[in-house]
Amino acid sequence: MLTLDCIYRASFALKNVIRRTDLIYAPQINNESQIYLKPENLQYTGSFKLRGACYKISCLTEEEKSRGVIACSAGNHAQGVALGATKHGIKSLICLPEGAPISKVEATKRYGADVCLVPGVYDDAYQKALQLKEEKGYTFIHPFDDEYVIAGQGTIGLELLNQLPDVEVVIVPIGGGGLISGVAYALKSLKPDVKVYGVQAQGAPSMLQSIEHERRECLSSVSTIADGIAVKEPGEHTFDLCSKYVDGIVTVTEDEICAAILALMEQQKLIAEGAGAVAVAAAMFNKVPVTGKKTICVVSGGNIDVTILSRVIGRGLDMSGRSYTVTLDLHDKPGELMGVATIVARLGGNIISVLHERNNNSNVTACFLRLVMETRNAEHISLIRNALLEAGYTIVN
């Protein structure tokens, strides 16, 4: 049974193992609130998962260690287990979904683990890990539904209260629920009036649906850029703890996640993965009541694959009004392209791509013009659109 003493013991055990990440004041995230970030993306291995994994491994018996450990993960728990096992001289095997970011797969190998890639998502990797555990006798290290793991993650809650004693709101990502379970339990045990909110991706709301239906729900599928929280079913322990100690759960869209990643990069010079940015997205887009409150957003991880980072940035620019694509139906005559470009330039838009297409079967005297431009914000986009319409141009999209 999880107790506050368990979390204090975990904190002591992890004293020389993990980095106690400092809070970062980030007022630009939401100018109506006092926002602080808990940057666990700066943790060793790039996420909070190191805490729970290392504490669990430190509590294993010698017999359990001798059998080697096996774990399943979307990527971050894998790295925590791999590093923790290697430090203790223990053999480790990690089951990862085939779609896990290459950066997470390679990092897991570098930390000393063997890797088994499994078709599907996290839950499929979980079933494969259980199968191999039975066949080979490994000791299983659950990524979230284990009281030692939860206690390890709960050390973040202790740190938050030490760093900002008068905190009023804490926002935490939710996948399987290990992080928020430990953090919420620690916070509510020591400061019952603090509000704790969980955030899930809109495409993977397993804990939200479970809480709403008052029983654990297993989703048929999950789809989100936030691979670290793409979990079909929450754990038994985590569901019970969230039911008791979490004040509310919200979801954020893919575009909101991308906008949050971009904001963290530009404003705070922090790299967050999708799962790591959902708490910030919830604060940015007022998904939880933070107005006038001292609020901490847990940035849970930063292990984003650089091959998809450019796409994330592109969507973030679109979401924040920093990039705009417009398609116009023009008369095919000299000067039309120049006329459009002149309006955009006069209003401060910066055209970075032009596609001029004459192949319009419906009207031989017409053509399409598609422009991609850099803009300042949504109001700037509206100004450019209105100017084009007032000049007599037809906007298709």
Where is each model-derived feature located?
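PLP-dependent amino-acid enzyme catalytic core
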Residues: 1-397
